[in-house]
A protein has these predicted regions:
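Hydrophobic alpha-helical segments within soluble ligand-binding/sensing domains
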Residues: 156-185, 225-234, 251, 292-310
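Central regulatory/effector-binding core of bacterial HTH transcription factors
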Residues: 82-128
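Flexible loop/hinge segments that line or gate small-molecule binding clefts
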Residues: 98, 121-170, 249, 275-287
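N-terminal helix-turn-helix/winged-helix DNA-binding helices
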Residues: 2-4, 42-78, 87, 97-98, ...
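Flexible loop/turn connectors
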Residues: 213, 235-353
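N-terminal helix-turn-helix DNA-binding module of bacterial transcription factors
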Residues: 1-58, 335, 340, 344-353
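An alpha-beta-alpha
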Residues: 169-210, 218, 317-331
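Short, solvent-exposed amphipathic alpha-helices that sit
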Residues: 37, 71-86, 167-170, 193-212, ...
Length: 353
């Protein structure tokens, strides 16, 4: 056979070569979980499955995501598409780009295509001011729906989100341990549920770790590099010495803005991102970030949708996934001076003249 050998597949799946052979030849005597491990190993190694082992497509699922220029959304889309294919479903990925189709428009198109279900990521359900009538209509007609990254208590469907409160607690514990007492939060518009939860979590964590001796300043812009830069200029002007950003892209913008003011990251200002998308370990310096568990969230979303398609309501309600703080090179001990870091840097330079 071309490509991976039986030994390669067996090693990847953690089974014997004989077991791999039985699966490839569709022989009995292999449990369903073991068979799936072998099939997954085939896919991972790029081996072309024999025709009789290819998943049979039983339907179409719609996946509505924000713009894919944010790597974390692209990673979610890829993971969900792969998981759905293993369940026998093709995926119609609908991207909401500025000036393009709206979420409601996509949902109408998907319904006309008679999709088996819809997964919406960071959609209207994350916006506390948005009209939820389209979601209620989907529930009323019985079309399976899963909402990811955002929460609306009025929608009786499975909802899965990053645990923003846990994220802020981890970030605060790390920064307070480094001596930081005035923290800035750079996030998007306050009408979004994840933004509100991050701010609430940050303030609660500061009270818990510093017993009222800390200070929090929030800047609401947009979830982009430029938004992060604008927020950082605002926060640095108010004397923060550490910035927690609502996304990795915002963190990159914050670092750029700090450097434009002659500040060093992390010597003058510490910066933490959110999501820990793939390239953040290669930035200069490597970005400290709160890693979103893309695989787990995507798996939960697909499992919830499959359960809904089967009529199982056990997955209904909200479930939170705890992120992981990955400490790299953009956080360091706070400077002893309590001055505004930009003013402190200018004062130090003046003393050297």
């Amino acid at each position: 056979m071309s490509g991976p050998t039986l030994a390669d597949i067996a090693y990847q799946a953690g089974v014997s070569q004989a077991t791999v052979s039985r699966v490839l030849n569709d022989k009995p005597g292999v449990s369903s979980p073991t068979r799936q491990c072998v099939l997954t190993a085939l896919d991972v190694l790029g081996y072309q499955r024999p025709t009789h082992l290819k998943p049979v497509t039983t339907g179409l699922v719609g996946l509505i995501v924000p713009e894919l220029t944010n790597p974390v959304f692209a990673n979610h889309a890829q993971a969900i598409e792969t998981l759905l294919s293993r369940e026998g479903y093709a995926t119609a990925v609908c991207t909401q780009a500025p000036g393009g189709m709206r979420e409601d428009d996509y949902i109408r198109v998907l319904r006309s295509r008679q999709v088996a279900g819809i997964i919406v990521m960071s959609g209207s359900h994350a916006d506390t001011t948005a009209d939820m009538s389209t979601y209620h209509e989907l529930v009323d007609v019985g079309l399976p729906l899963v909402l990811v990254n955002g929460y609306s208590p009025s929608i009786a469907v499975p909802q899965i989100s990053d645990d923003d409160v846990s994220a802020m607690d981890q970030a605060v514990a790390h920064l307070v341990g480094l001596g930081h007492k005035h923290l800035g939060l750079a996030v998007g518009p306050r009408r979004y549920v994840p933004v509100q939860r991050k701010e609430q979590g940050l303030r609660a964590a500061m009270d818990r770790h510093l017993e009222g001796r800390g200070r929090v300043t929030v800047s609401n812009t947009v979830f982009s590099v430029d938004g992060g830069a604008r927020a950082a200029v605002d926060l640095l002007g108010q004397g923060v010495n550490a910035i927690i950003c609502g996304s990795d892209l915002m963190a990159l913008g914050a670092i750029r803005a700090a450097r434009a003011q002659g500040l060093s990251v992390p010597d003058d200002v510490s910066v933490i991102g959110c999501d820990d998308s793939d390239l953040m370990r290669y930035t200069d310096p490597p970005l400290t970030s709160l890693r979103q568990d893309v695989e787990l969230i995507s798996t939960m979303a697909v499992q919830s949708l499959m359960g809904s398609i089967r009529g199982d309501t056990a997955f209904f309600g909200e479930r939170l996934v705890r992120p992981e703080l990955v400490i790299r090179g953009t956080t360091a001990s706070a400077r002893v001076s309590t001055m505004n870091p930009s003013v402190s840097r200018q004062h130090s330079a003046a003393l050297c003249l």
